From Swiss-Prot:
Pathway: Alkaloid biosynthesis. This is Tetrahydroanabasine acetyltransferase. The active site is at 164 (proton acceptor), 389 (proton acceptor). InterPro entries: CAT-like_dom_sf, Plant_acyltransferase. One of its GO terms (biological process) is alkaloid biosynthetic process.
């Protein structure tokens, strides 16, 4: 039975600032051009859910703070503050300010919350650090913060909030892994971090990449703008994914050759994009944009160091009119997603992206009608689950908490299944936000995945 939100009480302790356990350099470090792609105050919070440790003598808050302090010796920029430079760009002042850490105690057991597997957004938001609004335009949140909440069963959650201008998802995961390794007794992290942001600084170009969509042609929804936005987590099991892929291959004509099949990401991305557009009832002649993050660390020449933890993503983009998206065979849309992803991996595209962002950052702020753009992020392969064991047990779940950058309509995240639901092994969880009036239609589209005929 779901826990009653009104009954959930969380007692907060005083915020402390965890500093590196050893002296670290006091310098100001510049960020890369790609680091500046997100807004400087964009924070992405996630909640890691742990069952009660087998050794009940260990205090998870003490262990985490000790490990964090050790990890900050290697990741010392994360103990600093973001500052605006005279040229308008953001840098990180490595001033040893420390990482905000908040300890809390909940009045219930994790099982009463179903280990957040139902993903009640109101609960998830209480389990991450609440950043206060910036006081002026030159002040930004801390690069990272933690909130550890203990539950009556002995289990706990770790809410980690990271500034997207300092780390992308891969980088944040490596930082978390370093903390875990040190908490479990290692003397140093296996993967040593490197800064090297100069590798991704662009040049001014007179031929920037064109904006993929403009306000005049963007599709609009009668349901947007909306004040009543819902967040839902949909479970797509392994069998539904298999049937979807088989149906896509059947759509392809016998005369058409496919050197490789469709990936789970490509298949679900196209399906979710179309389902969302239908749910929003976008106008037929308007254009809709699917934009998704593409990890390019290994596609640079030479590849970035494994220890690089800054933003290293470009974006795949597909633009169709609503009529095309609604009426084309789904396999055609999946092919467009695959092609766009492959282009985003190329050295030429990576360079053009960086140079365009350096020359004209506004080009990446897509002008759109309400609901025209779906921004999709794939977290399945970041590595947050399951190999993040603090020496007790693996995490049972990991979920996003929609604060700040997540708190707008138009975002979708693909997640790995939780360890709480064995039936979802090999499946995908789809986290999405929509106006309340549009959610029933989207649910109908997602339910249809279960009855697709291969």
């Amino acid at each position: 039975m779901a826990y009653q939100m009104a009954s959930l009480k969380i007692e907060m302790k005083e915020v402390v600032h965890v500093k590196p356990s050893k002296p670290t350099p006091s310098i100001v470090l510049p960020l890369s051009t790609l680091d500046h792609r997100p807004y400087p105050d964009s924070i992405w919070p996630i909640v890691h859910v742990y069952q009660s440790p087998s050794n009940g003598q260990l205090d998870p808050a003490f262990v985490l703070k000790q490990a964090l302090s050790k990890a900050l010796v290697y990741y010392y920029p994360l103990a600093g503050k973001l500052v605006k430079q005279p040229n308008g760009k953001v840098a990180i002042n490595c001033n040893n300010d420390g990482v905000p850490f908040l300890e809390a105690i909940a009045n219930c057991e994790l099982s009463s919350l179903n280990y957040l597997d139902d993903h009640d957004i109101r609960i998830a938001k209480q389990l991450v650090f609440d950043f206060h609004p910036q006081q002026d335009e030159n002040e930004y949140p801390h690069p990272v913060s933690f909130k550890l909440t203990k539950f009556q069963c002995g289990g706990f959650t770790i809410g980690m909030s990271t500034s997207h201008i300092v780390c992308d998802g891969w980088g944040a995961c490596k930082f978390f892994h370093a903390i875990v390794e040190l908490a479990s007794g290692k003397s140093e992290p296996f993967l040593k971090p490197v800064w090297e942001r100069e590798r991704l600084i662009g040049s001014i170009t007179t031929q920037p990449m064109p904006n993929p969509m403009d306000e005049a042609t963007a599709a609009v929804s009668p349901f947007l703008p909306a004040t009543d936005v819902m967040y839902e987590l949909f479970k797509v099991d392994k069998e539904s994914i298999r049937r979807l892929k088989m149906s896509l291959m059947k759509e392809i004509s016998c005369n058409e050759s496919m050197e490789q099949g469709f990936t789970t990401f490509e298949s679900l991305a196209a399906y979710v994009w179309r389902s969302r557009a239908r749910a929003l009832n976008l106008n037929n002649e308007g254009k809709t944009l699917l934009v998704f993050s593409v990890q390019v660390r290994q596609h640079m020449s030479p590849p970035l160091s494994d220890g690089y933890y800054g933003t290293a993503i470009t974006e795949g983009q597909v633009v169709l009119t609503m009529k095309e998206l609604n009426e084309k065979p789904l396999s055609d849309i999946v092919k467009l997603v695959k092609e766009s992803k492959n282009v985003a991996f190329t050295g030429d595209f990576i360079k053009k992206t960086i140079d365009t962002l350096e020359s004209n950052p506004e080009n990446f702020n897509v002008e759109e009608g309400p609901g025209a753009t779906l921004a999709l992020s794939d977290w399945k392969h970041l590595g947050f689950m399951p190999n993040v064991d603090f020496g007790w047990k693996e995490p049972i779940n990991m979920v996003p908490a929609p604060c700040n950058m997540f708190e707008y309509e138009g975002l979708c995240i693909f997640l790995s299944p939780s360890n709480h639901d064995p039936s979802m092994e090999g499946g995908v969880r789809v986290f999405i936000s929509l106006p309340s009036v549009a959610m029933p239609k989207f649910k109908e589209e997602m339910e249809a995945l279960k009855v697709i005929t291969p």
